[in-house]
């Protein structure tokens, strides 16, 4: 019985985090979601309170279907350089829910909102140092006029318990985006 307690507690934490979910895209159409997306903002509570968040370069993501798996190629800024990462995702337990397995562990990825043509809001839940961690990301198909997408992002992240100080608008620096674009161009 004592050995079950940590797992029950972990399950409760995951359940509480999942219980804060908003309205997930019900009739999710993966074929409309495929393609190139710019990462223009994110929400996270991982930062140290009171410290200014340094500006980060914009990231990007390419979503493809390969052999019945969702193939994600992403680029993002970490520390002082761009990181290019390729992962696959399997369908989760509902529409717009996916499981991503990486060396560092599993992540649940949920498409919270999208109109497929201009923006997508993604909710990512993972276990970090034994604690459930949630990050929400705002992706856009273009770099132009994302006011409505940012408004929707602020509203949804607020509904999920993030404050304005947890939101980060990424710097309009395409260094990492170009890494992804050149990797895509060099594929056979």
Swiss-Prot record:
Q: List the disulfide bonds.
A: 82-176
Matches recorded under InterPro entries: Calycin (IPR012674), Lipocalin (IPR002345), Lipocalin_CS (IPR022272), Lipocln_cytosolic_FA-bd_dom (IPR000566)
Where is it made, tissue-wise? Synthesized exclusively in the proximal part (caput epididymidis) of the epididymis. It makes up a substantial part of the total protein in the epididymal luminal fluid and binds to the sperm membrane.
Assign the protein's first listed, main location to one coarse class: secreted
The protein's UniProt keywords, in alphabetical order, are:
Disulfide bond, Secreted, Signal, Transport
Q: How is it modified after translation?
A: There are two similar, immunologically cross-reacting forms of this protein, designated B and C, which probably result from different processing of the amino end.
Check the record and name the Pfam families matching this protein.
Lipocalin
| Listed GO CC annotations | extracellular region
Signal peptide (residue range): 1-19
Determine if Lipid metabolism is one of this entry's keywords.
no
Q: Gene3D superfamilies annotated for this entry?
A: 2.40.128.20
Q: Where in the cell is it found?
A: Secreted
Gene Ontology terms for molecular function: small molecule binding
Recorded family membership: Belongs to the calycin superfamily. Lipocalin family.
| Job of this protein | Associates with spermatozoa in the epididymal fluid but does not bind tightly to them. Binds both all-trans and 9-cis retinoic acid. May act as a retinoid carrier protein which is required for epididymal function and/or sperm maturation.
Output the PANTHER family linked to this UniProt entry: EPIDIDYMAL-SPECIFIC LIPOCALIN-5, LIPOCALIN
Which protein are we looking at?
A: Epididymal-specific lipocalin-5
- The gene name on file is Lcn5
């Amino acid at each position: 019985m004592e050995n079950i307690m940590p797992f029950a507690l972990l399950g409760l934490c995951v359940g509480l985090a999942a219980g804060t979910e908003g309205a997930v895209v019900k009739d999710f159409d993966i074929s409309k979601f495929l393609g190139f997306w710019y990462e223009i903002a994110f929400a996270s509570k991982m930062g140290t309170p009171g410290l200014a968040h340094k500006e980060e370069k914009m990231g990007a993501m390419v979503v493809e279907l390969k052999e019945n798996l969702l193939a994600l190629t992403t680029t993002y800024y970490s520390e002082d350089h761009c990181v290019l990462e390729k992962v696959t995702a399997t369908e989760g337990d509902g529409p717009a829910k996916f499981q991503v397995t990486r060396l560092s562990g599993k992540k649940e990825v949920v498409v919270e909102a999208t109109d497929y043509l201009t923006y997508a809001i993604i909710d990512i839940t993972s276990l970090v140092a034994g604690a459930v961690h949630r990050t929400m990301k705002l992706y856009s198909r273009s770099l132009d006029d994302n006011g409505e997408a940012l408004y929707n992002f602020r509203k949804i992240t607020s509904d999920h318990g993030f404050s304005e100080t947890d939101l980060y608008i990424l710097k309009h620096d395409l260094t990492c985006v170009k890494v992804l674009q050149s990797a895509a161009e060099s594929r056979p």
